Swiss-Prot record:
Keywords assigned by UniProt, alphabetized: Cytoplasm, Endocytosis, GTPase activation, Phosphoprotein, SH2 domain
Biased composition (Pro residues): 306-315, 419-431
Stored PROSITE patterns: RA, SH2, VPS9
Disulphide linkage map: none
The protein, known as: Ras and Rab interactor 2
Compositionally skewed regions (Low complexity) per UniProt: 439-450
Main location: cytoplasm
UniProt domain VPS9: residue ranges: 627-766
The organism of origin for this protein: Mus musculus (Mouse)
């Protein structure tokens, strides 16, 4: 057995997600077969009105068969015809099922009258976490069960599950089609699952919580399970069979790519897993050749059916406008690409832009089609595919569901050739599975769109600098104001010339990349758009303040007063926005709670500081020019530059001219930014570069006492007066929670270096800060921390020091990462793992304070207790101790003079 096959088996054992993918793929393939009845009936000489038509007319209705009979069908089948995926329905109706303020008793009262499978998402007051409340059948005993939703850095997942999602909507959409850790899949209310249009969903959403007690959801509790309509015997081939239902899931056969018909438009829509492409490519090359499909013509004779003509490349503005376009042409058949290509509607799926990115597959297909126009349409053997790297295995496993068929064209089994002439019956057309599937999937309206993951699909043709986090950090917000970074280009000798069409598509790829934004960036953009809308209270608040500040230049007496006022306004607006209902969907559904403040701070930078950047710079310059501080600084900069480094107290190696030019370029880049947080990031890079020069040229480590004179020397050599206002800008506008880390330390160092230059005198060595500069720093620190009576968890970096007491081994301690919503029960589980306790049920977490012991209850929050103890006027020495419950209450923790560092 080859190593690749063994690796594939290993992946298959732990990749249960792949089985789900194959199931969904075959399911969609069967659905597509059932939905081509109109096309088949025409070939058999039948009128469309004699079939079970799924044709959507302009009036939004659906035609029935001749008898007027209709068959019930499930909501997933309706989603295919209505182009409303599960994710669309969840997004439009979140005021119904997303009830974060609902109590446990109220949720139970709502779900008691609902059929099994109906759900709510609320926030538990006990755990301070979001929970999924699920209605259970009677045989489960309890009518309701709650599943905890875990929130990590920008991801959501259910407790006990290994699958994470970018936001709450995608999590719920996934569990509507797969149960994973749930006892069964979630079920949408009857009115939501049967709604035909977005306007109907919006009408339901306006009811909010009252939906559950209204007559809108009037499906009987014991109604039979819906099923899909049976295809007519005279219309559908014998291979189309009624699918059996097992627990609501169709029992279907999983097939390999070699078994799938991929040369016809009505072939099964499939997901080809790139991990097993090499294995199945052998089946494609050695398997039996299929005869060309034949269809009867008007005379009754058979003629070979040709593959459909390739759709033309998308319109020039299709990549930018497709998410917002509406459908205006009647759709005759789902897999039919000819009519769609004539009207330029190849890649249109959605009818209304939503806060989530549009489906990626249609854009990927559009780009691949444009790329393929430059290549000769000839069949070729499948290229070798290297084994995926270990760090990419999880990404492939998670991304295959939402982005199947998204592999590069060269990894596909082969390319389709043009239609053979009628005489060439014996030679079947070569098959191009991936290309055909991309074309079909661009027209697919299946609910699998809800499985798209933002960060799992690779960006082909996009080169990102992953060696530094700053490039990612500077990404979207400053692209309008920053000059493009200079990157080294490698000269490549190639005789291949890209056609103009491909070049045009490559230029528009930036529009495609916007669909890959993380929920954080989407929320920042949403808040920025809201700030420009004066129809909202938040927009009026921001626009009025920006206009007032620009029109009233005399309202501030100093630069510090102006910056403090802006910072105070940002804090107030951020607090309002965190409790406002103007954000739709709510920020809690897209961003984990411990990251909400960070995202709101970035949004404040974009919607307040960005429009004020030019005004603030001009005002700072006017203030410092009027008080004469810049004139004095300019003279002192010239004086310091004339001194030797040793006269400035520099006894470490200094940067050379080339390195000074790099530092000056970073300072110039800093001036173009409006975010104080990003300015600090660049300042940290400058300080890191200086430290690197000092250590590399001497071979020894240096401390802060040696660094400050070198930083003073570097600032003087850069000769930039604007650094004075840049440092003041950062010190006053930076979020106070960021002043306690590395950024605050080096920001203070830069302020001290400038103060040395401002107060430089010939008769004294510039080694010590003046008393005036020290007083300024003390006042600044006091001002930034006055209003923070109770320290937030960010002050302590989410760390908790826990001591572990054993009678035999004494006392040891560990620093654990404990977030604010982590309960004592969770901390005890973490301690049991860290300290390797064999019987954790006999241990608990205790608080030792004021010579007394107190066992903490399981539902308490150690970080909140820690914050309260730190905020007391008179500090108390306290310790968190993990020890046996039945032991000496005083123990030996502080015997023999041993003391632990306070938490």
């Amino acid at each position: 057995m080859s190593a690749w096959t063994m690796g594939a088996q290993g992946l298959d054992k732990r990749g249960s997600f792949f089985k789900l993918i194959d199931t969904i793929a075959s399911e969609i393939g069967e659905l597509k077969r059932e939905m081509v009845q109109t096309d088949i009936s025409r070939e058999n000489g039948l009128e469309p009105s004699e079939t079970h038509s799924m044709v959507r007319h302009k009036d939004g209705g659906y035609s029935e068969d001749k008898d007027g009979k209709t068959c019930p069908r499930d909501s997933g089948y309706d989603s295919l015809s209505n182009r409303l995926s599960i994710l669309d329905r969840l997004l439009h109706t979140h005021p119904i099922w997303l009830q974060l303020s609902l109590s446990e008793e109220e949720a139970a009262e709502v779900l008691q009258a609902q059929p099994p499978g109906i759900f709510l998402v609320r926030k538990s007051s006990k755990m301070q976490k979001k929970v999924l409340s699920l209605r259970l059948p009677c045989e489960f005993g309890a009518p309701l069960k709650e599943f905890t939703i875990k929130e990590s850095t920008y991801t959501f997942s259910l407790e006990g599950s290994g699958i994470s999602f970018a936001d709450l909507f995608r999590l719920i959409a996934f569990y509507c089609i797969s149960r994973d850790v749930l006892p069964f899949t979630l079920k949408l209310p009857y009115a939501i699952s049967t709604a035909k249009t977005e306007s109907q969903l919006e009408e339901l959403a306006q009811l909010g919580l009252n939906f559950w007690s209204s007559s809108a959801d009037n499906k009987p509790l014991n109604s039979p399970p819906p099923h899909r309509p049976l295809p007519s015997a005279g219309i559908c081939p014998a291979s189309l069979r009624q699918l059996c239902l097992i627990n609501g899931v169709h029992s279907i056969k999983t097939r390999t790519p070699s078994e799938l018909e991929c040369s016809q438009t009505n072939g099964a829509l499939c997901f080809i897993n790139p991990l097993f492409l090499k294995v199945h490519s052998q089946d494609l090359s050695t398997g039996p050749k299929r005869p060309s499909t034949r269809t009867p013509n008007a005379n009754g004779t058979e003629r070979p059916r040709s593959p459909p003509p390739r759709p033309p490349p998308p319109a020039i503005n299709s990549l930018h406008t497709s998410p917002g376009l509406s459908r205006t042409e009647p759709q005759t058949s789902m897999p039919e690409t000819v009519n769609h290509s004539k009207h330029g509607n190849v890649a249109l799926l959605g009818t209304k832009p939503t806060p989530i990115p549009p489906p990626r597959l249609k854009k990927q297909a559009s780009f691949l089609e444009a790329e393929s126009s430059a290549k000769t349409l000839t069949a070729r053997r499948p290229s070798r595919r290297s084994e995926p790297e270990p760090e990419l295995e999880l990404e492939l496993e998670m991304g295959t569901a939402g982005h199947a068929g998204g592999a590069p064209p060269r990894d596909a089994p082969g390319d389709c050739t043009r239609a053979p002439p009628p005489g060439s019956e014996s030679q079947p057309p070569p098959c191009h599975g991936a290309r055909q599937r991309l074309s079909d999937m661009s027209l697919s309206t299946s609910s699998s769109d809800s499985l798209e993951f933002d960060r799992s699909m690779p960006l082909y043709g996009y080169e990102a600098d992953t060696t530094s986090s700053l490039e990612d950090y500077e990404g979207e917000s400053d692209q309008e104001t920053m000059a493009p970074p200079i990157k080294s280009k490698k000269k490549r000798n190639s005789s291949f010339v890209l056609p103009k069409l491909v070049k045009s598509q490559l230029r528009k790829m930036s529009g495609v990349f916007s669909s890959f934004m993380t929920p954080e960036k989407r929320m920042v953009r949403r808040i920025a758009e809201l700030s420009r809308d004066k129809c909202t209270y938040f927009g009026c608040l921001v626009q009025d303040y920006v206009s007032f500040l620009k029109e009233n230049k005399e309202c501030h007496v100093s630069s510090t007063d102006m910056l403090q006022t802006i910072r105070q306004f940002m804090t107030q607006v951020k607090n309002y926005l965190s409790q406002s209902s103007e954000l739709d969907p709510p920020i809690e559904s897209l961003i984990p709670e411990d990251q909400i403040d960070v995202v709101l701070e970035k949004a404040m930078h974009k919607c307040i500081l960005k429009p004020l950047k030019g005004h603030v710079e001009a005002m700072l310059k006017d203030f410092h020019t009027a008080d004469g501080s810049w004139k004095q600084l300019k003279e002192n900069l010239q004086l310091v530059r004339q001194r030797n480094p040793q006269e400035l107290g520099v006894f470490a190696p200094t940067p050379d001219l080339m390195e000074l030019e790099k530092i000056k370029l970073k300072f110039m880049t800093m001036q173009k930014m409006y975010s104080p947080e990003k300015k600090v990031m660049l300042l940290l890079r400058v300080c890191k570069l200086i430290y690197t020069v000092m250590e590399n040229n001497s071979g020894r480590m240096y401390g802060a006492d040696d660094f400050l004179p070198v930083l003073t020397y570097v600032i003087a050599q850069c000769d930039m007066l604007e650094l004075d206002t840049e440092i003041e800008y950062m010190m006053e506008l930076l979020d106070p929670s960021l002043l306690h880390g590395e950024g605050g330390y080096y920001l203070t160092s830069a302020y001290g270096a400038l103060s040395l230059i401002k107060n430089f005198q010939e008769e004294q060595a510039a080694r010590l800060l003046s008393s005036e500069a020290r007083d300024t720093l003390r006042q600044w620190h006091k001002r930034r921390t006055t209003n923070r009576t109770i320290p937030s968890v960010d002050d302590f970096q989410n760390y908790l020091r826990v001591a572990f007491q054993e009678v035999n081994s004494g006392c040891t301690g560990k620093t654990l990462l404990v977030r604010p919503y982590i309960t004592t029960e969770d901390v005890c589980q973490l301690c049991a793992e860290k300290f390797k306790v064999e019987d954790p049920e006999e241990y608990s977490l205790f608080l030792f304070v004021d010579e007394t012991w107190q066992q903490l209850a399981e539902d308490t929050y150690p970080q909140k207790i820690k914050a309260e103890l730190h905020s007391r006027p008179q500090p108390h020495i306290f310790h968190f101790v993990y020890k046996r419950i039945k032991s000496d209450p005083y123990g030996v923790i502080f015997q023999n003079g041993e003391d632990l560092t306070p938490s």
